[in-house]
Amino acid sequence: MRVREPAVAGTFYPKDKEELNKLMDLLCGFEPKEKIKPKAILVPHAGYIYSGKTACEVYKRIEIPEKVVLLGPNHTGLGKPISVYSGDAWETPYGVVEIDGELREKILKYPYANPDEYAHLYEHSLEVQLPFLQRYARREFKILPIVVTFVEYEVAKDFGRFLGEVLKEEDALIVISSDMSHYVPAEEARKKDEILISAMERLNTEELYFKAVQYNITMCGVVPAVVGIESAKVLGATKGIVVDYSNSGDTTGDYSQVVAYLGMIFL
């Protein structure tokens, strides 16, 4: 059994289970009794002290089904353009989560999707989502991690629609992992991000992709967002709803150079 060990436990989040629990309790606070069942969510992937609260605001509100597809960007440059994790399980301080092998085989029928471990070895964007899922899941679940590089819009859109058709047969959640604007003043980040948030609220992936390029908006997961939103549309989603927006300055006190974080639910 090939188990991916945590690459960023101890840096992005505590590697000790009890310390992780304490931080989660601090960040997440009150958990609503009523849960939402979205087609997809968008959550950030920075260190928990920076973006954990925004991620929590989404995760604590949703029902987590038996299958979770994780879509994230490739920060390392390793692996294939559309990299579907080829191992058996992922580990975090909360334990081991199995990979959904049957779902993987269906996804690998897409021409540009490849089985791969290299893109996932050191990639943090999907790993940091797992402890949130483990904390709030009310039953066992399996995952399918997919890392996507900056592919052309038509490829991302087409893959998203393919993924959506596959997931029509499943009880599944799509998790899109992305931070928003990087290393700009907080006011500039908000103005730029509002352009992309507006597109995502309307599920307009073409506008999302090309305005990110046109205005040089450094949303690292714009391509995973195109894939995930197109999938959600196939599954019946009609809108995106902003749950939370924050930036690193809220933690550091320095608003002159921030990374911005967004939490969204797609229904």
Curated annotation (Swiss-Prot):
InterPro entries documented for this protein: MEMO1_fam (IPR002737)
Signal peptide: none
CDD domains hit by this protein: MEMO_like
Disulfide cross-links: none
Top-rank lineage group of the source organism: Bacteria
Pfam families membership: Memo
Similarity-based family: Belongs to the MEMO1 family.
Name assigned to this protein: MEMO1 family protein aq_890
Organism the protein comes from: Aquifex aeolicus (strain VF5)
Source species taxonomy: Bacteria, Pseudomonadati, Aquificota, Aquificia, Aquificales
